[in-house]
Amino acid sequence: MRDRLLAAEKVRAIEWRDSTLYLLDQRALPFEESWIAYDSAAGVAEAIRSMVVCGAPAIGISAAYGLVLAACGRSVAGGDWFAALEEDFTLLVDAAPAAVNLSWALNRMRERLERVREHADPLAALEAEALAIHESDREANLTMAQLGVDLIRRHQGNPQALLTHSNTGALATGGFGTALGVIRAAWLEGMVERVYADETRPWLQGSRLTAWELASEGIPVTVNVDAAAAHIMKTKGVTWVVVGADRITANGDVANQIGTYQLAVNAMHHGVRFMVVAPSSSIDMSLASGDDIPLAERAGEELLEIAGKRLGEGVEGFNPLFDVTPADLIDAIVTEKGVVERPDTAKMAQLMCRKRLH
């Protein structure tokens, strides 16, 4: 499976070359493939804020490279550049304060920095750590893809319809994707008849990004309006909903792109299994449940303009980025450490004690 996935790889969204970070601008897709070069932490932070790069793992990887860029700039300026990097840590964290992968990646970089203060070449050591974070995510994607396929096969090995939400593919990670990585692997194993991709309003990550990724690999994909998901589950033979996660709490609650919660409710009603695929870096054991997750919102004004005209006075917009799916609606959480079925606090704690499977 690993070799087949590697051979099928067509999309990469993050590249590090000659001490420069290159990001595929997701805002321009699918109409234009445009790469933007970054040489500062401030630029990377803005890329995260403005959604040039999306997806929890991809944000964390980009932030790690952003810190390398900051270190390079600080070292040239001279003085105690180690201490000065604290400003860059804060700048990058503030770009997406709710993204646990970002804080995880930066904390790992901070720990590495503490160990290399007396290193002959601390900048090279920091760069190596960022590259390791990137490669580790890629390897985790491969492991999760295999585990997810095994889970699907255990219930049904025949070609079947799957439904997904937002974008969880190569654009959102350092490799093949989390949920979309599982779907890719299932396609290679002959277990996918068609993928239904929620358009995922208001940023349309499903129709702009997921459909583009799947179509580029010849995987049959149908884009549907978000509100049609329940109807599709009822009439199109969907067997699994496969989604990613921005944050998972100690009890197995999952924060993800807005609309995920209603998918889980509808899946349970229709007897459709619900799988969450995310690296263990998305798990925040410091939060007891989803009630503790700060859920970001974008400006409600974004919803109040149609064809360049604002809706009538007295109308307000509610524009949440995320919602929380309770653990009791989830059939399985797939990570690179293993699979947790019917997650709860005890099972999540046991999972986090395991070593990575790759």
Swiss-Prot record:
Pathway: Amino-acid biosynthesis; L-methionine biosynthesis via salvage pathway; L-methionine from S-methyl-5-thio-alpha-D-ribose 1-phosphate: step 1/6. Keywords: Amino-acid biosynthesis, Isomerase, Methionine biosynthesis. Pfam families: IF-2B (PF01008). It is an enzyme of class 5 (isomerase). Substrate binds at residues 54-56, 205, 256-257. The active site is at residue 246. It catalyses: 5-(methylsulfanyl)-alpha-D-ribose 1-phosphate = 5-(methylsulfanyl)-D-ribulose 1-phosphate. GO terms for molecular function: S-methyl-5-thioribose-1-phosphate isomerase activity. The keyword S-adenosyl-L-methionine does not apply. It comes from the Bacteria. InterPro entries: IF-2B-related, IF-M1Pi, IF_2B-like_C, Initiation_fac_2B_a/b/d, M1Pi_N, NagB/RpiA_transferase-like. The record marks 166 as: Transition state stabilizer. Its EC number is 5.3.1.23. GO terms for biological process: L-methionine salvage from methylthioadenosine. Belongs to the eIF-2B alpha/beta/delta subunits family. MtnA subfamily. Catalyzes the interconversion of methylthioribose-1-phosphate (MTR-1-P) into methylthioribulose-1-phosphate (MTRu-1-P). PANTHER family: METHYLTHIORIBOSE-1-PHOSPHATE ISOMERASE. This is Methylthioribose-1-phosphate isomerase. It comes from Pseudomonas fluorescens (strain ATCC BAA-477 / NRRL B-23932 / Pf-5).
